[in-house]
Design a protein with these regions (language model features):
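Residue-level recognition of oxygen-bearing side chains
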Residues: 46, 77, 84, 127, ...
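N-terminal Rossmann-like NAD(P)+-binding domain of SDR-like oxidoreductases, especially those catalyzing
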Residues: 1-164, 289, 294-297, 303-320
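A glycine/serine/threonine-rich, flexible loop-to-helix segment
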Residues: 28, 116-117, 171-179, 255
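The catalytic Tyr-centered alpha-helix of NAD(P)H-dependent dehydrogenases
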Residues: 118, 130-137, 167, 171-175, ...
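Short histidine/acidic/glycine/proline-rich micro-motifs that form metal-
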Residues: 16, 163-166, 196-197, 257-258
Length: 320
């Protein structure tokens, strides 16, 4: 954002949960127009104090608990952060006159699509049919954003993206998990038979789309953001093995996730038609850039895969 709009001031609010890492922001912290606040978005008093002091013109709401497996294990924190936190931010916008609110959401709110119907895609008109506690919490927040737009006149938009990948991705997610495990010659745990399909979106393409929506999206509208990169999970794992020169015998099939969605696929026609956005990164190119980043930044992720993450990994995969 600062590289594209150096005249803007960027305020970053983050609770720094297990997935937060200040080292990720080292570059931004050097910029004179960047400020960081370690704050829980559910802390109404702290959020109001920031809004009163800084008077932000717009809010882009990325903050969320986002890992499906953790939501299955303990849904409560997902409901608190993803729903109540969204309410607090919107209340702050209304109270302090913030002009724009953008909700960053997920295609998972639509549920899933059958594997044998490649012609079917999620559009903005697809009914919400969440499958997991995570996606239900995001769907609830989306509905709340729509209600605040209609009831209170909040100038709000929503985007629903497909699976992101790229640098700084927390290693509990599929692609960084497989890269980290492969580099350590550890088993590569794949749910079920690995046939579940996801549409992959490079993180920089996602950021470009959000910037366009923030500045040109129509109030009250939903915009789907997809990468046109549908891949089976097992095929991604095999590509990572090939890129790193690791044997496929590291692949270990584990008990499937409860309620595992079969296929996600997004139709991004609306954002292309209205705002001119298209993904620029081919999956093969984005995956190579991602792998190269993890190879060059081992200190960043090796420091993470210890402590709480190690305990979580054992709970998720040890006996499956």
């Amino acid at each position: 954002m600062l590289s594209a709009h150096p005249e803007d001031t960027l305020l970053c609010v983050d609770k720094l949960t297990y997935a937060g890492n200040l080292s990720t922001l080292e570059g931004a912290m050097q910029h004179p127009n960047f400020q960081f606040f370690k704050t829980d978005i559910c802390d109404r008093g702290a959020i109001y104090a920031i809004f009163e002091a800084e008077k932000p013109d717009a809010v882009v709401h990325f903050a969320a608990e986002s890992h499906v497996d953790r939501s299955i294990e303990d849904p409560e924190i997902f409901l608190r952060t993803n729903i109540l936190g969204t309410q607090v931010l919107m209340d702050a916008c209304l109270k302090f006159g913030t002009k724009r609110f953008h909700q960053v959401s997920t295609d998972e709110v639509y549920g899933d699509l059958p594997l044998d119907r490649p012609d079917l895609l999620f559009t903005e008109e697809t009914p919400i049919r969440a499958s997991s506690p995570y996606s239900a919490s995001k769907a609830s927040a989306d509905l709340l954003v729509g209600a605040y737009h209609r009831t209170y006149g909040l100038n709000a938009t929503i985007s629903r993206c497909s699976n992101n990948y790229g640098p700084y991705h927390f290693p509990e997610k599929l692609i960084p998990l497989m890269i980290a495990n492969a580099l350590a010659d550890k088993p590569l745990p794949v749910y079920g038979e690995g046939l579940n399909v996801r549409d992959w979106l490079y993180v920089e393409d996602h950021c470009r789309a959000i910037d366009l929506i923030l500045r040109g999206g129509r109030p009250g509208e939903v915009y789907n953001i997809g990468g046109h990169n549908e891949m089976r999970n097992i095929d991604i794992v095999r590509l990572i093995c090939e890129a790193l020169g690791k044997p496929e015998r590291l692949i270990t099939y584990v008990t499937d996730r409860k309620g595992h969605d079969l296929r996600y696929a997004i139709d991004p026609t609306k954002i292309h038609r209205e705002l001119g956005w298209l993904p620029e990164t081919r999956f093969e190119d984005g995956l190579k850039k991602t792998i190269d980043w993890y190879l060059s930044n081992r200190d960043w992720w090796e420091a993470i895969i210890s402590g709480e993450y190690r305990d979580y990994y054992e709970r998720m995969y040890k006996d499956r």
